[in-house]
Each structure stands twice: as C-alpha cells, then as structure tokens.
C-alpha cells in the first residue's frame, strides 16, 4: 500500500531516531492495546524505516530510523505499511473479540475487558473475574474460540453511531473512549 503524503514536521532526537509527522497517514498509531504499524516512508531523496507509530495528542508520530538521504520539511513522500504484519495484527485483534465473547459465554456476563495487548505474534486479554479460571473452563473457552475460527466467518466493518451499534448488540468495552457520558448509557 503506497500513498503520497506531504511531510509535515521532522524532528531528530538524541537517540538517532527521526520523528515524522505527516499531514495525513495510512499508519495506525498504537491505541487501545493494539501496537502501531511499521513500514517505510520515502521518496527519491531519502528512505526512513518506520519502527513504531504513536499518538501524541492530535498528532500521529512516525518513529523512524533514517536509512539513506536527508529529510526536509514539506517533501512529498510515499508510505508503505508492512502489510503482512498488519494482517497478523488484524487476525489477533479479531481473536481478542472472539476470546472475550467465549469468556462471557463460559464464565458469565460479568466478564469485562480490563485491558489488552494486540501484537502480530500474540495477544493478551485482561479481564475482570473474581477467581482463577479452572482447566475445564479454559478447555471450553479454547473450544469455543477454535470452533468460531473454523467457521471462517467474514469480518464486516460498519461505521455507525454508538447508539445504533448498541441496538444491534455491540458491546462498548472501554466506555469512556466512545463518549464522555457513554458509561451512563450502557
């Protein structure tokens, strides 16, 4: 995936990393437990390897190692995301949702997500539960998740209001990320 973007701001830090802010970006910044994209930002004058993507307020910061050339402000650039890594992250993102639902199905609706880490190689899901999960329940949870994966259901994206999503059965996991008063609405 390659998109041309205008280079906004470039910052060089003491750690030899280059911090790039673009006017727009296809890179996903770390958020909600999901790690940020990596890839390449380049043009005919330079190449920079994006080693991490972070949010800082309203800005997306591309943390890069300069491979070659020099970067100047207001250059047009091409952005290339590591699409294989992103695909693996998407798979583990979906698996987090499957695991969360399986935990609710086996242990009860009191289970809520307290945090997560979505990485290309693994995932971690932190949940609230008053006791240790026994081996029998772990086996049942595994079976539910594996059966759902085996169904090979296509993933569909539908952008809608929080209210409409809740009417269709969506679960708001981190209420305050949706709206400031979303917790009162659940």
Residue ranges of each PLM-predicted region?
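Conserved nucleotide-binding/hydrolysis modules and their immediate coupling elements
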Residues: 4-5, 9-79, 84
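Short beta-alpha junctions and helix-cap segments that line functional grooves
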Residues: 50-53, 63-66, 112-114, 168-173
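Active/ligand-binding-proximal structured segments within catalytic/core domains
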Residues: 28-41, 72-127
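Single conserved hydrophobic/aromatic residue that forms the stacking wall/gate
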Residues: 1-11, 178-186
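Non-catalytic interaction/regulatory segments
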Residues: 120, 124-180
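Secondary-structure transition/capping motifs at alpha-helix termini
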Residues: 42-44, 69-72, 105-113, 133-136, ...
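Hydrophobic alpha-helical scaffolding
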Residues: 27-31, 54, 64-67, 71, ...
């Amino acid at each position: 995936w390659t998109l041309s973007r205008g280079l906004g701001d470039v910052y060089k830090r003491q750690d030899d990393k280059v911090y790039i802010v673009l006017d727009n970006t296809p890179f996903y910044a770390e958020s909600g437990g999901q790690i940020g994209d990596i890839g390449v930002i380049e043009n005919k004058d330079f190449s920079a390897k994006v080693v991490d993507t972070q949010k800082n307020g309203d800005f997306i910061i591309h943390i890069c190692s300069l491979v070659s050339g020099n970067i100047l402000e207001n250059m047009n650039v091409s952005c290339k995301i590591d699409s294989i890594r992103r695909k693996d992250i998407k798979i583990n993102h979906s698996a987090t949702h499957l695991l969360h639902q399986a935990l609710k199905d086996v242990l009860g609706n009191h289970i809520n997500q307290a945090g997560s880490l979505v990485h290309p190689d693994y995932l971690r899901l932190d949940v609230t539960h008053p006791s240790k999960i026994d081996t029998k329940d772990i086996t049942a949870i595994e079976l539910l998740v594996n059966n759902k994966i085996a169904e090979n259901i296509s993933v569909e994206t539908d952008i809608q209001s929080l209210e409409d999503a809740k009417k269709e059965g969506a679960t708001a996991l981190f209420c305050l990320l949706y709206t400031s008063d979303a917790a009162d609405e659940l």
